[in-house]
């Protein structure tokens, strides 16, 4: 899964990406220069816990957008426990936004039989 995210999200406007799956450690696939702190595993662990807490309490957390001052965080959670977080620039152009959307949709269908 990590290799797929590393390759698939090296897109214009994507600042960082990471994820995890049930029973596997979280990972940071990559982080751009201005978002280098996103390599910190604690960020992804906190995100995993937040998504799980939202799911546990009945919040509609399959697909969410989180707006911040300097970035937007897109999260996808699958039924099998796999999840993905992608930080993008807040002013993503149409072409980049469509490319990110296509990759997020592909993540929902991707078979990650191999370990993270």
Set out the residue ranges of the language-model regions.
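Non-catalytic interaction/Regulatory regions outside core domains
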Residues: 1-116
């Amino acid at each position: 899964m990590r290799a797929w995210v590393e390759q698939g999200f090296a897109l214009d406007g994507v600042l960082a990406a990471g994820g995890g799956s049930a029973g596997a450690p979280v990972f940071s696939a990559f982080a751009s220069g201005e978002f280098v702190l996103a390599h910190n595993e604690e960020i992804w662990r906190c995100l995993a816990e937040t998504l799980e807490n939202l799911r546990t309490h009945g919040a509609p957390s399959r697909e969410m957008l989180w707006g911040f001052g300097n970035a937007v965080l897109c999260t996808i959670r699958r039924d099998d426990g796999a999840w993905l977080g992608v930080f993008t620039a807040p002013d993503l152009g149409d072409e980049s936004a469509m490319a990110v959307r296509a990759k997020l949709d592909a993540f929902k269908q991707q078979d990650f039989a191999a370990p993270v």
